[in-house]
Amino acid sequence: MSIVLAIDTATAAVTAGIVAFDGHDCFTLAERVTVDAKAHVERLTPNVLVALADAELAMCELDAVVVGCGPGPFTGLRVGMATAAAYGHALGIPVHGVCSLDAIGVRTTGDTLVVTDARRHEVYWARYRDGVRIAGPAVGSPTDVDPGTALTVAGSPEHAALFGLPLCEPIYPTPAGLVAAVPDWSVSPIPLVALYLRRPDAKPITADNEPIVIGTLTPADVDRCAQLESQFFDGDNPWPAAAFDRELANSYNCYVGARTADTLVGYAGITRLGHTPPFEYEVHTIAVDPAYRGRGVGRRLLGELLDFAGSGAIYLEVRTDNETAIALYRSVGFERIGLRPRYYPASGADAYLMRREAQ
């Protein structure tokens, strides 16, 4: 019997649960669900700890983690995925990513449409037959979604009601549904990759005919990050692997990477400042392998950080002689607001302080 931590933040629900899994059946030992689309950061870890306490288990007794990887809004989705990756790394246990719609659909019977809120008057959707996905996932206006042969609709009640079909449960991904949605427990899990659907970054971009995929930075990437860091910022106190480890473990942070095949070729990170809204943000770093510069990778990485910050104001520092980076930041609304002399102590280089106003 395996003890699995299941978490999901792809919807308005902040879900954490402890599930016993015998290879066939799932038994929910404890679960905590808070429905608040603006409280993913604040509620996820407390929900995990309370679920563990309710199950009378210690963190060290977990055998695996399962996390919903979307589709879902950027900000909430990253919280769950980063937290799952941090638990897996700290405990030395596998982390399985699943489609959050599957965690709902797998608990349904017959032909069922599953929909969740995609914002912008759209829904994420997929169709299921006896718990197996037969169409989707996709995103679109409710009027453009074809229910097909669905006889019932599950998921967000507000959006499910738009389809004129009988409503059924679940409303949100459940811990047992997340565990049941893992396709093959005998296979080592692949790195977590967020499923956005709407943004171009959900699709591979190419560089010299090599597919480059933007995805979550994981603890398995820290050595490669440190290697690249020493190349990019030689003379400016490059971060060691331990520094990246610490940043990835902080649920207030969002770190993303650009990969070609199995090689990390770029990364970027941002942190949320403060504990109460309105929040502000600070870009920690953006770096792209010189061999892949000039192909839009840095702009894609920056776009992920801007999505994480949403409408909040964003700050960053940049070397005064890095004209390419300055031009990129200006193109998305950053303006110079100050100068920090000798900001980089090792090289003595100055930095501009830049700000993007709240949107």
From Swiss-Prot:
One of the GO BP terms on file: tRNA threonylcarbamoyladenosine modification
Keyword annotations of the record: Signal
SUPFAM superfamilies per record: Actin-like ATPase domain (SSF53067), Acyl-CoA N-acyltransferases (Nat) (SSF55729)
GO MF annotations, alphabetized: protein-N-terminal-alanine acetyltransferase activity
Signal sequence extent: 1-15
N-acetyltransferase domain: residues covered: 212-359
One Pfam family from the record: TsaD
Name used for this protein in its record: Uncharacterized protein ML0378
Organism listed in the record: Mycobacterium leprae (strain TN)
